[in-house]
């Protein structure tokens, strides 16, 4: 039986991933951890502990004590926040990954690791439309630089030590269950909360800032499907492109107005606009589709409907 450790279980991805993993593997076999308290359904639905991934000694004791066989390492300083504390963000993002890689190298029981990369690995010199799996990666953000370095490290550990690390270059992720957490694509979460609360939203990106996005349910399924795929089917051991759907704030606002006709949006781009300008507008994910059968359920219309329903329910409106 798999014993799974999720690091960063209080975050946007982790809080929903834990729920899905517990459905698949049994609640008692999925250990949720974070440096802060997680949502109630994570804490009450199975084992939860406060754990700092930067504390290597405590980490190895936890893994051995609970006979961990898989690790999902999701803890990170995200793109917008990383620009405010560049050296600290680099240190946290890289040292935490190296702690996990060294642990997986030394502990034979650990068979697989998941670590998320991001479209932030791309930069201004990358082809912006239908960005290929193999292309120019010259990121110009702290977050992107750390993700690109991480991609090289996970492939190195696979080739040198046989550590089976799997990774997805996530696009912007959209969920109503946890509010935004300092990322450049977080407008696509904030907009729904403000639409329901206030009937208007001030976007920190321009109206034509088209970016790849993905509804969280699709992202969680893709993550677990990749981890469950046969190793022999995987043609790469760095990080897979995953496209989701591409839209800009103007298009998303128009979709919201179909449900809330009086909704208004204004545009006041901040420092995150420059980050968005350096990222792809659309992604080619044909390699992921060929290797492990990547599929999507949500387009922009379905995503908008479910987000508005979910936010209203969460806010009790």
Residue ranges and their predicted role:
Residues 4-23:
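N-terminal Rossmann NAD(P)H-binding glycine-rich loop of SDR-like oxidoreductase domains
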Residues 82, 170-180, 190-214, 218:
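A conserved pocket-lining segment of Rossmann-fold NAD(P)-dependent short-chain dehydrogenase/reductase
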Residues 98-141:
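Conserved Rossmann-fold NAD(P)-dependent oxidoreductase catalytic core, especially the SDR/UDP-sugar
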